Amino acid sequence: MMAAVKSTEAHPSSNKDPTQGQKSALQGNSPDSEASRQRFRQFCYQEVTGPHEAFSKLWELCCQWLRPKTHSKEEILELLVLEQFLTILPEEIQTWVREQHPENGEEAVALVEDVQRAPGQQVLDSEKDLKVLMKEMAPLGATRESLRSQWKQEVQPEEPTFKGSQSSHQRPGEQSEAWLAPQAPRNLPQNTGLHDQETGAVVWTAGSQGPAMRDNRAVSLCQQEWMCPGPAQRALYRGATQRKDSHVSLATGVPWGYEETKTLLAILSSSQFYGKLQTCQQNSQIYRAMAEGLWEQGFLRTPEQCRTKFKSLQLSYRKVRRGRVPEPCIFYEEMNALSGSWASAPPMASDAVPGQEGSDIEAGELNHQNGEPTEVEDGTVDGADRDEKDFRNPGQEVRKLDLPVLFPNRLGFEFKNEIKKENLKWDDSEEVEINKALQRKSRGVYWHSELQKGLESEPTSRRQCRNSPGESEEKTPSQEKMSHQSFCARDKACTHILCGKNCSQSVHSPHKPALKLEKVSQCPECGKTFSRSSYLVRHQRIHTGEKPHKCSECGKGFSERSNLTAHLRTHTGERPYQCGQCGKSFNQSSSLIVHQRTHTGEKPYQCIVCGKRFNNSSQFSAHRRIHTGESPYKCAVCGKIFNNSSHFSAHRKTHTGEKPYRCSHCERGFTKNSALTRHQTVHMKAVLSSQEGRDAL
């Protein structure tokens, strides 16, 4: 057996291609690698004297085959998977594929596909195949060069190029090489997959679900494939294109890096994309152009990924600008520059956006009102933005607020109370939801969420003043006027909020009262506004440091009564919130919610810089300070600074000598709960050892 292996190894270079050394370093199934693999797989225990020598020999043979010093982990896995793939192939295909010495799994798959596409034809040598194919396809210009590079660099996919973007940089006297290629037949179907009767393959077009990307790029790929002179060439071109597209899909699910996000923002700032996206955020052509711009810079992203990232950046920027997030967004300056440049530009007509007609319009960062950009409320965040997790978790315990909201009816508007939910975790939780409705007080009215959803579902250019949800869009001028009059709720001349039409005083119902908002109270320190003076008083305690609520047990002060109630449970030992899965109890509902995420695996807080995810907001805030370099917590005694509040609290106890965590066995005190947990393992070991001693007796 070993003699056969040695005979195979004796002349490994006689049939070796001289250009093989210039290819990738993997050389997965080259003759040398195949001989090493066979020596490893065919090694017998009887060839050595003992188990130690057998194990050492196997180790040596495995290193000769996989070469861990020169190969990465991915390359070693590639070799193992390639070996198993070749083993499970049918014998008639396996023999021929092994003779071709595929260098990686992708090349092996391509060889098997070639055999299956032409089962009755003789498969030629790869270089000969290439020469014949290039000779037949010589008139195809750019397509020929694409095929040559795809054939020779199957392992390393080339960066995609887009003729549409390149043609814009050509001089007027030049003509793109792509236009010299023969045109596809004019009767080529555009809505269905065209079945190639000679090869049994399906040529995918724009309307079908194929391996290539859809819409314009799918049509381009289909036409280039149709230009191939024969069925074999079309099959080869299709295989190369599919392998190229498979690398694009590798970027799916990969977090956005810092440089990649900066490149996306640079593309937005150097074009009219950002302004167009404010009028139509679901325009697929714009996101496709953004993806092409990223591809030209070496970043592989799909249009849908560009759309999701753009809306995530918008959401983060909007939160920071409105004071909802204490730490600044890392790309705040870039987004602020984009928003300012678009706001100063003249308003664009709806028909200036390519492909807007017939597309779904979403409510975005800005909205047109009488030709001027005005900020929209947080309630208009669409479904895609709602998928981007808020910095606060909406699933935590909420309190109910009675907020007067304007509801539409057939005669106009009326005020009703709507239950509002807000997070208890933030100290200004009660004023956040009210502040969202009042911080843009120039609007003059509250909008009900159901009314907003109905407005968002209509295109901006077609939004009409409606009398009822079921009313038709097409109306006579008199009907439209009456419908518009019923929508205006003031008893004096006003400008309509939705469409900008002026309404005289006579069109309003005399019995309708004028809409008035409660006076807004503003904090002189930070400028935040509140609908009630009591909310302002409570907020000012943050600046003054006042803590009127004192614990009768330890004297600790709190600015909120709810925080004092939660603190008292540490003295009484009350833990009313219990986990339904493991039975663990907590004294705060927010702690239970964070704990439950350990069972569900939910991590709603994701860093936009590195993509790392967290299951609670405190860890997320501390992590973001790593990127910004911020350390807001400073010890007044020694001057040491911290970026994490929990570490800062533990450090302060070293100065005060406070040890709130005590062992129930020996009454020893600790400054950290983790230190107490480690200490309790000592007692547990002692208990277990004593039980084992009694069992032995």
From Swiss-Prot:
SMART domains reported for this sequence: SCAN (SM00431), ZnF_C2H2 (SM00355)
Cellular compartments per GO CC: nucleus
Record localization: Nucleus
UniProt biased composition (Basic and acidic residues): 383-395, 451-461, 472-482
Keyword Membrane included in the entry's annotation: no
InterPro entries cross-referenced by the UniProt entry: KRAB_dom_sf, Myb_DNA-bind_4, SCAN_dom, SCAN_sf, Zinc_finger/UBP_domain, Znf_C2H2_sf, Znf_C2H2_type
Entry protein name: Zinc finger and SCAN domain-containing protein 32
Species of provenance: Homo sapiens (Human)
